[in-house]
């Protein structure tokens, strides 16, 4: 068996949570391979809205194994709050959620460091979520991290050493803070975490594959936030691309099957950083309002713009995408015309590739007729208006990959599969 991978292709917030929930009935295992509680996967069904930050989206399917991989960074306090909310809704986590011993822990001082580093940068700040993600990955790379498996061996000693090191840094930054409440909640989270099964996730996943089990790997954020291939330095601290599933779960490259790339029918971005197709007019405000574009974790209003096919083609290339999934088509239902960026202008020269630095590039647009039809109640591609089919054909021609799934609303039922005869 091979693993299938679901990735965001833009700057995150593409709607991965809903799609994973739609796809999970086809899989035995759902595994999260990177990121932390800085990104939220929003799912909406049966009239209730859920936001998952660290827990894989397969948790809503009663018979699935869910794995938090070694590439994930975990905040015990936030994990406890998230898990208890799910348990209160009737979902049994203890038996079905396994956590890699090699996953790194976000310490209370990591969150303080995150705030201190951002404050020190002033106007040059990245716009982090303040969840301690960057400092945790920094400790991981510098071989100073504390891992889930450390809870079982010499934990107090390792925690104290990390805390002392962080406090020394904070002293140098002259940053005032109070750790007491954060620490209190964190240690309660540690005790709660001990109720879960800690595993060597690389052995577990490869063993499940050997037994013929199907596995879906779930990424957080999006390709354009990848630490290497995103719009650096306005990126996250982990590899969000397809290869991140290999390092974040212990899966060999030849074990990868389908790669689902998910994107919105337009573009959004949260926080600072270049955004070539960003709209600053009433059209941008309209997309934001219709799309309810507010961060599920931060509560921040998202920046909105037209779809960027240059960035999307780049993401498809580095991820090896085999199937595309388009979200939030319904947000554009009322637009008379729709624009798509097909090239950039750099110093007056037109280019069709994603350059080293996208700061200051100008988008080159083509205009397409809108479909001006309410698609939210449609259940089959046979109901798609002619203009929407033309839009899909244009995207497939530009991107070279089929759009297999189209979302026409927030509910899991508002999901239409195409090419079902294949």
Label each region the model flagged:
Residues 1-422:
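Non-transmembrane, aqueous-exposed alpha-helical and coiled segments at domain scale
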């Amino acid at each position: 068996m091979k693993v299938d991978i679901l990735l965001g292709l833009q700057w995150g917030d593409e709607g991965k949570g809903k799609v994973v929930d739609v796809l999970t009935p086809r899989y035995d295992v759902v595994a999260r391979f990177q990121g932390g509680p800085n990104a939220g996967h929003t799912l909406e069904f049966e009239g209730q809205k859920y936001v998952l930050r660290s827990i894989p989206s397969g948790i809503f399917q009663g018979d699935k194994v869910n794995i938090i991989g070694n590439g994930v960074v975990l905040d015990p306090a936030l994990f406890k709050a998230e898990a208890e909310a799910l348990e209160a809704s009737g979902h049994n986590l203890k038996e079905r959620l396994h956590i890699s011993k090699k996953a790194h822990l976000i310490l209370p001082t990591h969150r303080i460091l995150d705030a201190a580093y951002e404050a020190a940068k002033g106007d040059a700040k990245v716009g982090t979520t303040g969840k301690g993600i960057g400092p945790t990955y920094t400790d991981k790379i510098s071989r100073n991290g504390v891992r889930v498996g450390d809870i079982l061996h010499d934990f107090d000693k390792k925690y104290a050493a990390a805390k002392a090191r962080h406090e020394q840094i904070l002293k140098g930054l002259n940053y005032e803070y109070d750790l007491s409440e954060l620490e209190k909640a964190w240690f309660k989270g540690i005790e709660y975490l001990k109720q879960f099964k800690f595993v060597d996730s690389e052995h577990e996943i490869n063993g499940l594959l050997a037994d013929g089990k199907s596995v879906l790997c779930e990424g957080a954020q999006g390709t354009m936030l990848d630490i290497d291939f995103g719009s650096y330095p306005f990126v996250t601290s982990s590899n969000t691309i397809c290869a991140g599933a290999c390092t974040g779960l212990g899966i060999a490259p030849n074990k990868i099957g389908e790669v689902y790339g998910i994107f919105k029918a337009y573009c959004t971005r949260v926080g600072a950083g270049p955004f070539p197709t960003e709209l600053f007019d009433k059209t941008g405000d309209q997309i934001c309002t219709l799309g309810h574009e507010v961060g599920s974790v931060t509560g921040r209003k998202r920046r909105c713009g037209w779809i960027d096919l240059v960035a999307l083609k780049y993401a498809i290339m580095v991820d090896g995408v085999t199937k595309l999934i388009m979200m939030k088509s319904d947000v554009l239902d009322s637009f008379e015309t729709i624009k798509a960026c097909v090239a950039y202008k750099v110093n007056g020269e037109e280019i069709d590739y994603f350059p080293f630095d996208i700061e200051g590039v100008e988008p080159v647009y083509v205009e397409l007729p809108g479909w001006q039809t309410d698609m939210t109640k449609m259940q089959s591609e046979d109901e798609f208006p002619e203009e929407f089919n033309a839009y899909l054909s244009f995207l497939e021609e530009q991107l070279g990959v089929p759009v297999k799934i189209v979302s026409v609303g927030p509910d899991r039922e508002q999901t239409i599969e195409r090419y079902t005869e294949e």
